[in-house]
Amino acid sequence: MEMRRKDRILGEEEILEILNKSEYGILSTIGIDNSPYGVPMNFVYEDGVIYFHCAKAIGYKVSNIIYNSNACFTVVNDICLQPEIFSIKYSSAIIFGKVSIVEDEAEKKKALEAIVKKLSPENIEAGMKYIDNNKSKVYVLKMEVTEMTGKGKK
């Protein structure tokens, strides 16, 4: 669908900046009963895909992904309410794609390391040790990006 407010469209470089500086976003999936399900998740954008991690359990998120791999991921940054003029400043990205569970152990480890480097750069060594001790307890989810859109108001 085409964006209505063309004056607020952000380019790919701005979208990537949003993804790289954001700590979390909302991953939205579709359930077996066709109900939407959105869950906040931290993530990393690496090599053109988005990686997430979660407990190695079959809850709503994972069962939805197994049922239907189509998903949407939304990130919002730089929010500044302007109550006196009934407006808001923001930058946002909406990513569409297909999500799967990463089965390859090398890719899984690489994704977890990228998440640690992004979200805990001051604890890299401890993070790598934590990954080695706990990677069997988590799923890494991979979103193959099919479309990215960005919108903002400065």
Each model region followed by its residue ranges:
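Active-site-adjacent structural patch at catalytic or cofactor/ligand-binding sites
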Residues: A55-K56, Y67-C80, K89-V99
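Short beta-strand segments
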Residues: S22-A57, F73-T74
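Extreme N-terminal tail/first-helix region
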Residues: M1-K21
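Anion-coordinating catalytic cores for phosphoryl-, nucleotidyl-, and glycosidic chemistry
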Residues: D7, L16, Y60-V62, F73
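Structural motif corresponding to alpha-helix initiation and N-cap regions
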Residues: E12, I58-G59
